[in-house]
Each structure stands twice: as C-alpha cells, then as structure tokens.
Amino acid sequence: MNNAPVIHCEKLSKTYVEGKLRVPVLHEVEFSVAPGERIAIVGASGAGKSTFLQLLGGLDKPSNGKIWVNGNDINQLSEREKGLLRNQHLGFVYQFHHLLPEFNALENVCIPLLVRGGIKPKHARQKASAYLEKVGLSHRQKHRVGELSGGEKQRVALARALVTEPCCVLADEPTGNLDQKTAEQVADLTLQLNRSLNISFVIVTHNREFADKMDRVLLLDKGQLQSESERNH
C-alpha cells in the first residue's frame, strides 16, 4: 500500500506585494496530507486559509517553497499542466457551489469527466449518476440547478469534486452558506464519503463541530500552521 503523502509542502511562503506595500500571509509552512486523511484548517478571517488552499491547488503561486501533489512538483508545471493535474488528482468544493445553471445535476457532475477526455459521454453519465447516488440525489439527476435546495446544490458540488476519483479534495467553507441542520447533513456526508472512498480532504471551516470530526485540526495564525488536535483512528 502506498503511504506517500498525496499533498506535501516545504517552507511554503506567500507575500502579496503592491508597490511598496508587502503583506506576508504564509511563512515557511510545512504540511503533508496522508492518503485518506481528513484535515480541518481553522483560523480568524483574513488569516490566509483560502490563500493556502489556492496554493495547494496550484491556483496561486507561492513566493517561496515547494508543493508536491501526488508526487508532482507543481512549481515546475506550466499552467496547462497544472490544469491537467487538478483535473486528474484534485477535487474542489467552495462555499458557493459554482454549478452551471443551464445544466441539470447530472450534466454538472459529468463536466470534469468530459473535460478530462478519454471517456464516452454515455459512460460519463453512468459514472456521474453513480456519484449522485452516493450523495443521495439519484432522484434529482434531471433537475436544473434552480430547482435544487441549497443543501442539494452542495451535494451536487461534492459529487462533481469526487467523480474524477481525486487523491484529495480541497474544500473552502463547504457548509458556510447552509443552515445548521443542512450543514450537519453535508458535513456527515463528507465524512462518510471520506471513509468509503479513502479520498483525502483538506477543509477550511469556521464550523467547529465539523472541524472536531477531522483527523487533525490545524490553526493558521500569523502565517504558521499549528496543531490544535490530532486523532488516531
């Protein structure tokens, strides 16, 4: 069994520069994600949590340091290669679902598979349907985005993130726009899928109950990640 980290970074730093103004956000962060591990990133608003996720996903460039995703040094990749790496190895879930309103749930989940290529549309639909079933929405596959509730939209977004079978899902406040009951349901579903699919999750959240169910809770403060809690499962 391969126990190599699915994401690993060394001395990761990020400073935003505007003219003479320098805003340090991250300073020499060391971080690794094991296969199947679930990690919560917590911290005050503006601490740099979303920036950290963007760096891990190759959506922003670090000022210093290195990041490996499934063994690939993303600093050495072109933008096109980063896009291919994201499609193959990473899934993304955001506070806002970012579903395309002109398509139904099934079509939205199909999109990452069709972008990747090498799969017939029929088989992409079959796989997308299977993942909608995993998130409890097999009965809503043909419904357009506007016909879905907030919780259902986020479930579709979760299925879309998982359908390519990534090594890790990066989630930024995935329950932030939901009421408490729906947030609990989406959080529990996320944990269930983490266990059943053995896909790692790195989740930025202000939801303390959700964070406390993770394997590790890391606090981002003053540019550094500090361990708050760790569990042995």
UniProtKB/Swiss-Prot annotation:
Pfam families noted in UniProt: ABC_tran
Major site of localization recorded for this protein: membrane
Molecular function terms from GO: ATP binding; ATP hydrolysis activity; transmembrane transporter activity
Topology in membrane: Peripheral membrane protein
Keyword terms of this UniProt record: ATP-binding, Cell inner membrane, Cell membrane, Membrane, Nucleotide-binding, Translocase, Transport
InterPro entries for the chain: AAA+_ATPase, ABC_transporter-like_ATP-bd, ABC_transporter-like_CS, ABC_transpr_LolD-like, LolD_lipo_ATP-bd, MacB-like_ATP-bd, P-loop_NTPase
Key word Zinc present: no
Its job: Part of the ABC transporter complex LolCDE involved in the translocation of mature outer membrane-directed lipoproteins, from the inner membrane to the periplasmic chaperone, LolA. Responsible for the formation of the LolA-lipoprotein complex in an ATP-dependent manner.
Residue ranges constituting the ABC transporter domain according to the UniProt record: 7-233
Compartments, as annotated in UniProt: Cell inner membrane
Catalytic activity, EC: 7.6.2.-
Amino acids binding ATP: 43-50
Gene: lolD
One GO cellular component term noted in the UniProt record for this chain: plasma membrane
Keyword Translocase: yes
Protein name: Lipoprotein-releasing system ATP-binding protein LolD
GO terms classed as biological process: lipoprotein localization to outer membrane; protein localization to outer membrane; transmembrane transport
Subunit architecture: The complex is composed of two ATP-binding proteins (LolD) and two transmembrane proteins (LolC and LolE).
UniProt record similarity statement: Belongs to the ABC transporter superfamily. Lipoprotein translocase (TC 3.A.1.125) family.
